[in-house]
């Protein structure tokens, strides 16, 4: 099954975090994929790194940035086209690690409605959308980015916030 279709199916069929995690870990997929899964309880978060038939799940350092943790022989981190012909596999892994470590340092507090965490190396020439979510509080915030002549994108939309009352 294509990874995006598995994700859609998981949203449609799973009633809780545990069921979603099982489905994302065990359903065969057509190609490797990295999922970040978050529930409503503080302990409900993980990164699921999938190959077609196997998985590795991390419950600590639950951010992902286009590379496996730890790096695996035969797999290289993805990089932007501006670095495509000039970066080694080690460089690509380093860029992904830097993004992941930057995200890990963000405290994730949704009380502050800002996107100060969207900075290099998370912010890159291809950033077009930043999203902050808190399922427990029913909050979803987004900001659109685009390049305005500079080397990096800048916010070009107002922050959009959707706040729902959590289900009891």
In which residue ranges do the predicted regions lie?
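C-terminal, well-structured catalytic/ligand-binding subdomain of enzymes
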Residues: 1-168
């Amino acid at each position: 099954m294509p990874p995006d279709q598995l994700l859609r199916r998981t949203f449609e069929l799973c009633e809780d975090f545990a069921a979603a995690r099982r489905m994302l870990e065990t359903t065969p997929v057509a190609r490797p994929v990295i999922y970040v899964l978050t529930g409503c309880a503080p302990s409900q978060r993980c990164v699921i790194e999938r190959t077609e038939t196997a998985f590795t799940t991390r419950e600590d350092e639950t951010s992902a940035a286009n590379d496996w943790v730890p790096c695996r022989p035969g797999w290289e981190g993805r990089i932007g086209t501006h670095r495509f012909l000039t970066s080694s596999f080690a460089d690509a892994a380093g860029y992904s690690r830097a993004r992941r470590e930057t995200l890990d340092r963000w405290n994730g507090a949704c009380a502050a409605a800002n996107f100060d965490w969207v900075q290099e190396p998370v912010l890159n020439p291809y950033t077009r959308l930043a999203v902050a979510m808190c399922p427990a509080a029913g909050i979803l915030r987004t900001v659109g980015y685009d390049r305005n002549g500079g080397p990096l994108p800048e916010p070009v939309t107002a922050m959009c916030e959707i706040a729902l009352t959590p289900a009891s």
